[in-house]
Amino acid sequence: MEARMTGRRKVTRRDAMADAARAVGVACLGGFSLAALVRTASPVDARAIRPPGALPEQDFLAACVHCGLCVQACPYGTLSLAEWSDEAELGTPFFTPREVPCYMCKDVPCARACPTGALDRDIPSIRDADMGVAVLVGHETCLNYKGLNCSICVRVCPIRGDAISLEPQEIDGRRVMIPVVHSASCTGCGTCEKQCVLGHAAIRVLPRDLGLGGPGRNRAGRKA
């Protein structure tokens, strides 16, 4: 039997074949473990913003088959399928409001295209969608808090007056008009985040459970 020296150990062909088999087994086990990790990764802390009509996150992940039909149906190129570096489970649809918000199509084509019900095809209206909720995260940077008069987030809101408004507040002895999000009406479309004039938007869309610490998506949209 042929043999060769590796360091101080004499390695036979049989030893080499056994080592190779063990390496393959470890690789397979590692691949299985990685796949299992991806499948069972908890989405609790995920900040992914889902398309309108999405079921609660766990139900959504169970129903979504990663087909991409919702992405193809969106006329604005809002939706993408998640890659490894994204804040969403691999292959699932999401969008980044700062890049392209949801333009709230009345016929909700993305939900209508879903073959499994991961996106609720029976959502009554786009105004019933619960993609998330806008949250004013940049109190230190929002121009209104600095005493300036900016109303862009209010003016661009597709349901202006219901989802967001300017309300008077006293800050450091000054009377200023501050953007106030009315979460019961906000759909999380992200138009306000997209149009914020700051380099880092002072207003951001977050999943409802993360933004408000309350119940998130449900099949009929938001519950008051």
Curated annotation (Swiss-Prot):
Keywords: 4Fe-4S, Electron transport, Iron, Iron-sulfur, Metal-binding, Plasmid, Repeat, Signal, Transport. Pathway: One-carbon metabolism; methylamine degradation. Pfam families: Fer4_7. Residues 54-84, 91-124, 133-169, 177-208 form the 4Fe-4S ferredoxin-type domain. It comes from Paracoccus denitrificans (strain Pd 1222). InterPro entries: 4Fe4S_Fe-S-bd, 4Fe4S_Fe_S_CS, MauM_NapG. Residues 1-41 form the signal peptide. [4Fe-4S] cluster 2 binds at C102, C105, C110, C114. [4Fe-4S] cluster 1 binds at C64, C67, C70, C74. [4Fe-4S] cluster 4 binds at C186, C189, C192, C196. Involved in electron transfer. [4Fe-4S] cluster 3 binds at C142, C150, C153, C157. One of its GO terms (molecular function) is metal ion binding. The keyword Nucleotide-binding does not apply. This is Methylamine utilization ferredoxin-type protein MauM.
